[in-house]
Structures are given as C-alpha cells and as structure tokens.
A protein has these predicted regions:
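Predominantly extracellular/luminal carbohydrate-interaction, adhesion, and secreted-enzyme modules
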Residues: 1-235
Length: 235
C-alpha cells in the first residue's frame, strides 16, 4: 500500500522506471497490515528517478504497518540485478520532521526492506587533521520519528533511520536525524545489514531507543551486521 503506487514490477526484459517531475505533496496518513510506503508500497525491479526540478513534500502525519515493512519512500524495494541507484537529495525529497512511522519489523525512515539496491545521498563529511568530523549539520534525508512515541512496539526489530533491513545493498552519503525505538537490531542508518556496504553516512539523534534497558543489538550506525563473504563499512 502506497500513497501513489501500491505495487509495481517489470513485465518485460527491462526494468520499469518511474520518473518524478514537478512538485508533489503527499499528505495522507496511511495505515495497513504490512508493506506500507508514503509513496510506494512494494517495488520489484522498478527504477526511481528524481529530476533536478522535482520536489516531493512528504507531509504525512503518520505511516503505520501493524505487522511490519514500512518506510517514507517505499515499504519494500528489490532488484534482481545489483547496481540500480536511487539518488536521495533532502532538497528534493522533503520529509515532515513530525512524521510518525510505526511498525513491527523492517521499518526504515526511507525504505523498510531493501534488496540489491543502492541509495546515494548528498552528504559529504569533512574531517579535521585529527580525523574528527567538523562538518556542519546538514538537512537530514530523514528527520522524523520511528516507533518513538507511546505505546511503544515492544517487540519491534530491524528498525533503521534510513533502512530497516538491507540485503546485498549499498548506502552512501546519507545523513539522518531520527528519533528511533526498537526492541532489537536497531541502527541509526540500518537496523539489520546483510552483505551490505555503507560509506560516508552520518547520524544525529537525541532520542535513541528511549532508554530501553532490555534492548539488544542497538548501534549508532547498524544494529546487526552479517555477511557471507565480505562486509564493507568505509565510514
């Protein structure tokens, strides 16, 4: 279920492409059982492109998947072949800082569940001579709330500021500022990362997991990471 498209998949040899142009405002709150996205519900082999002149204002008050898989841009996004890139510019994809995303598992600020995809932002960290980040705080690609208000989702897992669950994917140059809560595998960028690369990403948050003393696998960047061959985090 999505604000614009519920489900899309390719029907021919070439992947389907959605090109977003002009200005659009998404305001509706969306509630369902699973695979909920502010714009797209579930996309298979569907390329998303933003034109430089486009503006997407995500003014949704809330997005909720009672069982799980939820994100502001898409609930689930997957590709058969690697290398498909989505460019995320916070000046183009403008998300309401008061948005409330709720779900049980695989919940992310941008995408709930990502497979074989690449997300690239505009953030460039700057370092001092002593390798301390001195960059000014930029506009975050996701500034909202994920399961961060009562009643909490006590069993929520794979919760991330950008992606809830990422497999065989790449995230780079993304900055997020979420208020985030989960019971396990909670990360500022990715909740659960499997065979996934992360580089040049940053997180700033004042509310992280709401002091849940029983929470496990909680990380500023990644909640839990696993790999079958190699895992790269050149952060």
């Amino acid at each position: 279920m999505g604000g614009m498209i519920g489900y899309s998949h390719k029907t021919h040899a070439n992947a389907f492409t959605i090109e977003l142009k002009g200005e659009s405002l998404f305001h509706a709150s969306i509630t369902g059982q699973s695979v909920i996205g502010g714009i797209f519900g579930s996309l298979d082999d569907t390329q998303i492109q933003f034109t430089p002149a486009s503006r997407l204002y995500m003014d949704n008050e809330s997005l909720e998947a009672s069982s799980g898989i939820c994100g502001t841009l898409a609930g689930a996004l997957s590709y058969q072949e690697p290398g498909k890139e989505i460019l995320l510019d916070p000046e183009i994809l403008v998300i309401n800082p008061n948005i409330k995303i709720k779900g049980g598992n695989n919940v992310g600020g941008i995408i709930g569940k990502l497979y074989n995809g690449t997300l690239t932002g505009t953030y460039t960290p700057e370092f001092s001579t002593t390798n301390v980040i001195v960059s000014k705080i930029p506009r975050p690609i996701f500034p909202g709330n994920i399961n961060s208000e009562k009643p909490y989702r006590e069993n929520a897992a794979s919760i991330g500021g950008i992606v809830g669950y990422a497999d065989k994917s790449t995230l780079r140059r993304l900055f997020t500022q979420p208020s985030i809560y989960g019971r396990s595998t909670v990360g500022g960028i990715i909740g659960y990362a499997s065979d996934t690369q992360i580089s040049d990403c940053g997180v700033k948050t004042e509310t992280f997991n709401n002091g849940n003393n029983s929470a496990i696998m909680v990380g500023g960047i990644i909640g839990q990471a696993s790999c079958s061959s190699h895992l790269s985090f050149p952060i």
